[in-house]
From Swiss-Prot:
Descriptive protein name: DNA-directed RNA polymerase subunit alpha
GO biological process, one term: DNA-templated transcription
CDD domains linked to this entry: RNAP_alpha_NTD
Pfam family, one: RNA_pol_A_bac
Residue numbers spanned by region Alpha N-terminal domain (alpha-NTD): 1-233
Gene Ontology terms for molecular function: DNA binding; DNA-directed RNA polymerase activity; protein dimerization activity
Residue intervals passing through the bilayer: none
Species this protein is from: Oryza sativa subsp. japonica (Rice)
Enzyme class name: transferase
Location(s) in or outside the cell: Plastid, Chloroplast
Listed EC numbers: 2.7.7.6
Recorded family membership: Belongs to the RNA polymerase alpha chain family.
Recorded catalytic activity of this chain's protein: RNA(n) + a ribonucleoside 5'-triphosphate = RNA(n+1) + diphosphate
Length: 337
């Protein structure tokens, strides 16, 4: 049987930081590239990284403030220009850098008249302030001013219901998002069968992480999410002593082909290569381009997965199932293609 040779990139994926700058203490910028990627891969990687950078990257922020006997957050404190609510909003904007886990405490204890900035916060050793000039309040009179703060490392945006409190403790809507913005773009290169894509990724952070550090963390988080799928044991799969063999309930399209075999005879699906099915060369090459090499790979795909393969046609799907009916003792659903 003659097989058509399909050209493809054999180069190793490489990434590089092509631009890095500090626009201000609270605005870092980085631009990265990843290449070479096959058609469609750049979009897949770009979407996943953008979501992980914005939603999964951890940050440290102030989550609570305790002023003493203050009746409510709209109160004013004698000798202070700002209301309690304005001070809470200023504390919310403080950018912290740390590697702590759990909750830590901090405090502010000063005497007026003077401006209070982030530099006046007394922090635990594991925490530092990115921009010490960030304003907090203005003391207009020679009064003592003290705030107890709670600091926590987390991810995302968290709000808490404000309850009437007698001890002057107020929650702060915590924004644990060190990545301010992420953009990605795709550039197509090459021609013919040698086409490939380059992914450009732009990251802006608040200074608590550099863009490169944020990219590392987001990548690790994505890897951790997919690791369970690499484990040998899978729910619903009955493995025998030979891990390459399992019974037929999962030899199907995920939802539609739930009972492919009439009998309970076991088939070593990952030992049957698509080369052995004597498929037409066009269909064979479509499957190979999609990294489908064995019967197990093939039967793990849904109809929608196959139709998304580049150049895959309805006739190719029909040919595949006609071949499976011919070679395997399966009860395949009719008119699937």
């Amino acid at each position: 049987m003659v097989r058509e040779e399909v050209a493809g990139s054999t180069q190793t994926l490489q990434w590089k930081c092509v631009e890095s700058r500090v626009d201000s203490k609270r605005l870092y910028y980085g631009r990265f590239i990843l290449s070479p990627l096959r058609k469609g891969q750049a979009d897949t990687v770009g979407i996943a990284l953008r979501r992980a950078l914005l939603g999964e990257t951890e940050g440290t922020c102030i989550t609570h403030a305790k002023f003493g006997s203050v009746p409510h957050e709209y109160s004013t404190i004698a000798g202070i220009e700002e209301s309690v609510q304005e001070i809470l909003l200023n504390l919310k904007e403080i950018v912290l850098r740390s590697n702590l886990y759990g909750v830590r405490t901090a405090s502010i204890c000063v005497k007026g008249p003077r401006y209070i900035t982030a530099q006046d916060i007394i922090l635990p050793p594991s925490v530092e302030i990115v921009d010490t000039a960030q304003p907090i309040a203005n003391l207009t009179e020679p009064t003592d001013f003290r705030i107890e703060l709670r600091i926590k490392r987390d991810r995302g945006y968290h709000t808490e219901v404000r309850k009437n409190t007698q001890d002057g403790s107020y929650p702060i809507d915590a924004v644990s998002m060190p990545v301010r913005n992420v953009n990605y773009s795709i550039f197509a290169c090459g021609n013919g069968n040698a086409k490939y894509e380059i992914l450009f990724l732009e990251i802006w952070t608040n200074g608590s992480l550099t863009p490169k550090e944020a990219l590392y963390e987001a990548s690790r988080n994505l890897i951790d999410l997919f690791l369970p799928f690499l484990h040998t044991e899978e729910e619903g799969t009955r493995f025998q002593e030979n891990k390459n063999r399992f019974t037929s309930p999962l030899l199907s399209f995920q939802k539609r082909l739930t009972n492919l075999k009439k009998n309970k005879k076991r088939i070593p699906l990952n030992c049957i290569f698509i080369d052995q099915l004597e498929l037409p060369s066009r269909t064979y090459n479509c499957l190979k381009r999609a990294n489908i090499h064995t019967l197990l790979d093939l039967l793990s795909k849904t109809e929608e997965d196959l139709m998304r393969i580049d150049s895959f046609r309805m006739q190719d799907g029909k040919q595949i199932w006609d071949t499976l009916e011919k070679h395997l003792p399966m009860d395949l659903p009719k008119n699937k293609f």
